[in-house]
Structures are given as structure tokens and as C-alpha cells.
């Protein structure tokens, strides 16, 4: 992870193109340089796969932007203040909902995510990618139980979308989204 000095230099010299998704991609690529995901690949490749899932679900630009930034507070050394200089409030607030408070338990973390529709959508994509990494025909016990955990968490998050009335335009949209998440 970069030092605060490195991040401040990046922020001072960054020239935004005005494309929110491109800016988020640049931030994520910088923040996660040298970091690895759960499978030993670059963390940015995980970020890109999450974004690809969101693009496949035809999510809007703000959701795609949040997808790029979803690990930046926890693993990238950036702060909420850093994000607020470059991104609209709805984006950085969702990223804050996705960040872990190291003192809270997993249930409190998920309750925090459930307060934000964009955070829920991005977390479902994040967990779907994490689950895909361990999908194989002969999982170890640890992989099996991780899959069970990811499936349970995806189900919980998908159920949480129901409280956002604008989430789906029809019952069919909701059931189709749930099927894609399985």
C-alpha cells in the first residue's frame, strides 16, 4: 500500500478527464498496485472482474464507478475526503458503506451495506467474484464452507434489495437478478 505522502502526491497531480468511471479506474489501479486478491492475482484484476459483472447487469455509471472503488478505503489507503474531492456524494457514500469498520462484526458490516442500494449491488458482484474464484469440482472443506458463506451473504443482500422500491421495474427483473446471482 502507498504511503499517505504518495497518495497526496497522486491526488495533487491527477488530471481528471471528467469521465467518472475512468477516474475511478485510475484511482483503483494506482491504489492497488502490487496487491494480490484471494487467488494470488493482482487485486486490480478482481476489481475489473467485479466491474465486468456490474456491466453485464447493465448497471449505470455511478454503480460501475463504485465497483472500481469498492476496496479503495480498506485496501488502498484512500480516505472518504480523498474521494469526495473527485466523486459525487452518492458515489463516495456508497464506497463508505462498503468499507469495513475494523471494530464491527460481519453482521454489523452487512447492516451498514444494507443501508445503500448501490452498495448492495456492488457487494453482490464482489461476493460473486470471490465465490467464482473457489468454484471447482473438488473443493476443500474450507472452500466448501466459504461457498456456503458467500451464497448465504448473496441471498441476504438480494433480499435486502426489496426495500428499495425503484430497484426493479418488475417482479421478473427481481427473479432474473436472483437467478444470475446463484
What feature does the model see in each segment?
Residues 1-182:
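Active-site helical microenvironments for divalent-metal-assisted chemistry
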